UniProtKB/Swiss-Prot annotation:
Presence of the UniProt keyword RNA-binding in the record: yes
SMART domains the UniProt entry points to: RRM
Compartments where found: Cytoplasm
Descriptive protein name: Eukaryotic translation initiation factor 3 subunit G-2
Lineage top rank: taxon: Eukaryota
Organism: Drosophila pseudoobscura pseudoobscura
Gene this protein is translated from: eIF3g2
Chain's role: RNA-binding component of the eukaryotic translation initiation factor 3 (eIF-3) complex, which is involved in protein synthesis of a specialized repertoire of mRNAs and, together with other initiation factors, stimulates binding of mRNA and methionyl-tRNAi to the 40S ribosome. The eIF-3 complex specifically targets and initiates translation of a subset of mRNAs involved in cell proliferation. This subunit can bind 18S rRNA.
Length: 274
């Protein structure tokens, strides 16, 4: 049987992929041209020619050997070097090594901080000085002084209100609420009249922090900070027993709604235990 004769056009068409001619490459001097064929958005066959400039440079031997590694996967049949169909050449980043002398020169050119410039920050007025040297310390800008002034005003108001009524006041309510029998050995119902409950405390609250919070308001006889049994962290509330009832009232007026450790405190009278 004689083999079937085919025309040269059929043989060329059979070599095409999806009816597109193969990619052609040719070099002229230091320029490399790559001609590719593809379909555009309108479905028409177009020819794309890319031009590459050939540059010769000296590289380390390990880099040259790495470029001749055998390729794998979809690029196993590609020639050495990057292939435009599977590889996108990004911008080269060159590493520059700086000597210690150049580094010292660069640091000398940088603007340095003035010798007399202070880097301290005041927590009262946010000035460039230490808080202990703040000129506004002890004024209305100082939060501690503000709490002390509020406590004094609240105590004075409580005394003036009691004197204006002219009514009989029990001995245990005079002089701040627990002048008689207000100590630790007093009856529970007497002590609870000067006890306040502070809630919405953070987990990191300690007895020292609690004492620091209330010691400016007035003397107290007992502090209780509720803690978790397993972790030892604060449960979020505490009880403070003041020596005088007027100090307890001042604590409610001053600390209720006061911001402490990024939380808003809630202070109220302690309810009597059944």
């Amino acid at each position: 049987m004689k083999p079937m004769k085919t025309s040269w056009a059929d043989e060329v068409e059979a070599d095409y992929v999806d009816g597109l001619p193969p990619t052609k490459e040719y070099t002229q001097g230091n320029l490399k041209f790559v001609a590719e064929y593809k379909y555009n958005e309108d479905g028409k066959k177009v020819k794309v020619v890319r031009t590459y400039k050939i540059q010769k440079q000296t590289v380390p031997k390990v880099v040259a050997r790495r470029r001749n590694w055998s390729k794998f996967g979809d690029s196993r049949l590609d020639k050495p070097g990057p292939c435009s169909q599977t590889t996108m050449v990004a911008e080269e980043v060159h590493m520059v090594f700086i000597s210690s002398k150049e580094l010292e020169q660069a640091q000398a050119q940088e603007p340095q901080m003035e010798p007399g410039k202070n880097i301290a920050r005041c927590r009262i007025c946010n000035g460039e000085h230490w808080s202990v040297n703040c000129p506004y310390k002890g004024t209305s800008m100082d939060s501690k002084t503000l709490m002390e002034s509020k406590a004094t005003a609240a105590a004075a108001a409580a005394v003036s209100d009691a004197s204006k009524t002219g009514k009989y006041v029990s001995p245990f309510l005079k002089e701040g609420g627990c002048a008689i029998g207000g100590g630790i050995g007093a009856k529970p119902w007497v002590r609870e009249r000067s006890a306040v409950r502070i809630s919405n405390l953070s987990e990191s609250m300690t007895e020292a922090d609690l004492e620091e919070l209330v010691k400016k308001i007035g003397p107290h006889t007992k502090l209780y900070l509720a803690r978790e049994k397993n972790t030892g962290l604060c449960k979020g509330f505490a009880y403070v027993h003041f020596k005088f009832r007027q100090d307890a009232a001042a604590a409610i007026e001053i600390l209720n709604g006061h911001g402490y450790d990024h939380l808003i405190l809630c202070v109220e009278w302690s309810k009597p235990q059944p």
